Design a protein with these regions (language model features):
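Interaction-mediating elements
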Residues: 1-191
Length: 191
């Protein structure tokens, strides 16, 4: 009399990746005053826009939706997002033997190992696809935050230019009048 034996094996595959995306760019500021003063004015303008000054006072930072934006006094803007992603998937394989278990155990285990290897390859593709999806999501978040924050940085540059022009005018002579209309500024100086 023969019996059928069923052997199952289950594995969980886990992969953890640290995904980063970012960029660095340089902003141009008119050199109305010496670079260190222009840098201080820029950082002060960014603080008014919600940035936080670092303890050394050489840069400002702001974090939005996991994106860290750093602007230094030299006008270098760095934006970076970093996230750790863990993907799990479980695979199961079953092998059977219709003969005496002792004699055909190796054949059943061979079937299981072959099935598991095939499923591992499929699972790795699924894991890589999920990680690629997450990488695309992170990039979209970075682009969205930068598009929004560009307006604040542009406004800070304009504010910096206006403050620098006022200081330069005061150095040249007596300021008679200052008229501001939005981003337009008219300064009258008596030399």
């Amino acid at each position: 009399m023969s019996r059928a034996y069923v052997v199952s094996q289950k594995e969980t595959l886990t992969e953890t990746k640290n995904i980063k995306d970012g960029l660095e760019t340089k902003i141009d500021i008119l050199p109305i005053l010496p670079p260190e003063i222009m840098g201080e004015l820029l950082l002060d303008s960014l603080v008014e826009k919600g940035y936080k000054k670092d303890p050394c006072g050489t840069s400002v930072t702001k974090e939005i939706d996991g994106v860290l934006i750093v602007v230094d006094g030299g006008g270098t803007v760095t934006a970076e997002i970093q996230e750790e992603v863990t993907v799990n998937t479980t695979i199961t394989a079953t092998g059977r033997s219709d003969e005496d278990y002792k004699d055909h155990h190796e054949r059943a285990m061979s079937q299981i190992n072959q099935k598991l290897e095939e499923q591992r390859e499929q699972a790795k593709k699924i894991i890589n696809d999920k990680i690629d999806e997450k990488r695309a999501d992170i990039t979209k978040t970075l682009e969205k935050v930068l598009a929004t924050e560009k307006k604040n940085i542009d406004e800070a540059i304009n504010d910096t230019t206006i403050k620098a022009l006022k200081q330069k005018a005061a150095q040249l002579g007596e300021i008679i009048s200052i008229e501001e209309s939005g981003q337009d500024v008219t300064i009258r100086v008596k030399v």
